[in-house]
């Protein structure tokens, strides 16, 4: 009996390694995710459109209007972990007082999409490495811009969404005072709610504490 136990203990790590993909990761699937949420409700992926009144979605990866030129998602949905979603809701409340609102381009991103992006564009300055997984894969990142609530129009920012130009970097100087003000506003409002802007994308905000969450590979169709 002891011999069998020792053999099992020896083989267990080998089984775990075998389950990893070619990038060395074993992203969490639906059943394991459900178990983790039961243990810790903060890990729940929340439907942002249902939680946040007035939130506008423009999920580019559910269309061909993105840097891949392909439709990556089959549904135009936006999810985030519970604390991330609640923080974004507070940002929406703060912006509403200024006559502004949030338009979301992307939020939780299944790991398989990150693999696709990497295969299309290998520069990890702009796309996440599948060897590590992304903040989006953890449900802890939001791609967004600001809109005028009266007109529904986006505020002018330094570049469009998903630009690979240096002009998209938050540190790049901006000559136009209106654009400079808009960029500073979105960064400050999100900072107040616990988000940090990505160093190469003015639209990308990571939630502080994202390291506590695992990489997920769950399709939108599997989520409520």
Q: Which stretches of residues belong to each language-model region?
A:
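Bacterial Sec-dependent N-terminal signal peptides
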Residues: 1-22
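Extracytoplasmic cell-surface/polysaccharide-interacting catalytic and binding patches
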Residues: 18-105, 120, 124-200, 209-224
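Segments that shape or occlude catalytic/ligand-binding pockets
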Residues: 110
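Aromatic-lined carbohydrate-binding/catalytic grooves of carbohydrate-active enzymes
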Residues: 114
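Short active-site loop/helix that positions an aromatic residue
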Residues: 117
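Conserved metal-phosphate-binding beta-hairpin within the catalytic cores
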Residues: 205
